[in-house]
Amino acid sequence: MTSKLNKIGVLTSGGDSPGMNAAVRAVVRSAVYNNIDCFGIYKGFEGLIIDDFVKLNARGVNNIVNKGATILKSARSLEFRKKEWRKKAKTNLDKYEIDSLVVIGGNGSLTGAMLLEEEHGIKTIGIPGTIDNDLVGTRCTLGYDTALNTAVNAIDKIRDTASSHNRLFFIEVMGKGSGHIALNAGIGAGAEEILIPEQNMGLDRLLGSLKKSEKSGKSSSIIVVSEGEKIGDNVFKFSSHIEKNLPHYEIRVSILGHIQRGGSPTCFDRVLASRMGVHAVDCLLSNQSKVMVGIIDDKMVTVPIEKAIKGGQDLDKDLVRVCDIISI
């Protein structure tokens, strides 16, 4: 059954991810295709509160499918965590007669969308826009593939200089408690060790592994480390321990940081964003809401937002096994 929609709002929230622009473009053009007015909201939930809205049309989103960042900007809004500011957001949405909202972001952003619907009846659809790949109900989140490729390209370059100087490099990648980037980028770049939160390796085991590698003839090594709660927490802890116990190693630390969030999205992320954006509007038209769109077995699916934001996505056990076998 097709639902009658007044107007649709779209925003990007939280940490940016490559492909957000392509998703915004798809939402806007899908709305226009279905004769529905679409408004962009600047700076995420902050824009909902301060009334920073702009009406968008098909031509207004020209030539952004290939661009990184987000034309709508993004922000983390502490105010939106409070009921009184969510009520203010509803007042502003009513001002523009917007009754449906597509939120592109990670678990915090989707939580905000869910609360807005539960408290004020605004129909919400989530698009998983985060490089961390840590949401339940989708094989890939938007921007994850681009971040992986960025990380692998950077590690490849570090590998060159590590080999030239017989150095041991600890390289930190993003993930916010999720090891997906570290595991896949580490395998793709041929890392000797990959340290992820889901597999607590321990300092002594890492020490033994490096000694074994040295005996087998390895003169340089790459160790990929998933970030902790704060940037550098894990990578400096591991590197300091090895430096104390293997002082003959020449050790360097490299934190890839925010380059993983930037850059032109890969073809995979552009196509994924386009599919997710169209599917988000389709969901609203079919009277679905408070769900996140995702991709499973190359098919568009939906999952309740409440489920999507809980737990995190399990690592592929076969990939962990592959890593153990080929990193000797």
Regions found by a protein language model. Give the residues of each.
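Glycine-rich oxoanion-binding loops at beta->alpha junctions
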Residues: T2, L48-V103, G108-S109, L142-N149, ...
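N-terminal phosphate-binding or glycine-rich loops at protein starts, especially the Walker A/P-loop
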Residues: T2-I49
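Short, ordered loop/turn segments at secondary-structure junctions
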Residues: S13-D16, I41-G47, R76-S77, G106-N107, ...
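Short glycine/serine/threonine-rich phosphate/pyrophosphate-binding segments
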Residues: S17-V27, I49, K82-K87, L101-M114, ...
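A glycine- and small-aliphatic-rich helix-loop capping segment at beta-alpha/alpha-beta transitions
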Residues: R25-N34, V54-G60, L115-G126, L142-D145, ...
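Accessory alpha-helical/coil subdomains and C-terminal extensions
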Residues: C38, V103-G105, T111, L115, ...
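C-terminal non-catalytic interaction/assembly regions of soluble proteins
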Residues: S240-I328
